[in-house]
Amino acid sequence: MSKLSRRQQEILDYIKEEVRAKGYPPSVREIGEAVGLASSSTVHGHLSRLEKKGYIRRDPTKPRAIEVLDLENLASETTEAKATYIPVVGKVTAGLPITAVENVEEYFPLPEQLTANDNTYALRIQGDSMIEAGIFDGDLVIVRQQQTADNGDIIVAMTEEDEATVKRFFREKDYIRLQPENSTMEPIILTTCTILGKVIGVFRTIH
């Protein structure tokens, strides 16, 4: 393997430490904070060079997944269940793929059996519009990317104002109704919307 720069070695060592401690690799943001890099694009650049030099592998079918290739010594130190790392989307930008680098804050491990395909991502909920469906502010919803939905499905949709929202979907005769699960809120009525995926699960950290 090619020799690493000091910064690349710091990043690789940090990834290994996190895998030892947690059983899964750190987010790009966490890597930047650990080694003193404020720019996520700079971190991505170092990760690309580590990959080219053969130290890590990033699976393009599983966005943001990082696999350290010299983990023989770590294998006996972690009891990690086999997991798929899905991107956590902090925002949705019109015109960009939902899992574009610009949208992704970190990644999150899920058991492989919960991800039927590679088109799964997580979205952090902001607000209380879905509380009566058991989805609360700060929760992560697990979303399967798809462009269609049945009436009653909870979906991630892009509205006509290019804003992403999580609501229950209903196609009425002359319009689309995005229904909040909060009796104090009114539905969103649209002539059209772009469906970005169906919510298939919720993850919440109990403090």
UniProtKB/Swiss-Prot annotation:
MF terms from GO for this chain are:
DNA binding; serine-type endopeptidase activity
Residues in the active site?
Answer: 129 (for autocatalytic cleavage activity), 167 (for autocatalytic cleavage activity)
Q: Which GO terms describe its biological process?
A: DNA repair; DNA replication; negative regulation of DNA-templated transcription; proteolysis; SOS response
Output the InterPro entries linked to this UniProt entry. Answer: ArsR-like_HTH, LexA, LexA-like, LexA/Signal_pep-like_sf, LexA_DNA-bd_dom, LexA_repressor, Peptidase_S24_LexA, Peptidase_S24_S26A/B/C
Which residues mediate DNA binding here? Answer: 28-48
Give the SUPFAM superfamilies listed for this entry. LexA/Signal peptidase, Winged helix' DNA-binding domain
Q: What is its EC number?
A: 3.4.21.88
According to UniProt, where does the site described as Cleavage lie? 94-95
Key word Cytoplasm present in the record?
Answer: no
Pfam families recorded for this chain?
A: LexA_DNA_bind, Peptidase_S24
Q: Could you tell me which PANTHER family the record lists for this protein?
A: LEXA REPRESSOR, LEXA REPRESSOR-RELATED
Q: Which NCBIfam families match?
A: lexA (TIGR00498)
Q: What quaternary structure, including any partners, is listed in this protein's UniProt entry?
A: Homodimer.
Q: Which family does it belong to?
A: Belongs to the peptidase S24 family.
| Name by which UniProt lists this protein | LexA repressor
Instruction: Please tell me the species this chain comes from.
Output: Halalkalibacterium halodurans (strain ATCC BAA-125 / DSM 18197 / FERM 7344 / JCM 9153 / C-125) (Bacillus halodurans)
Please name the taxonomic classification of the source: Bacteria, Bacillati, Bacillota, Bacilli, Bacillales
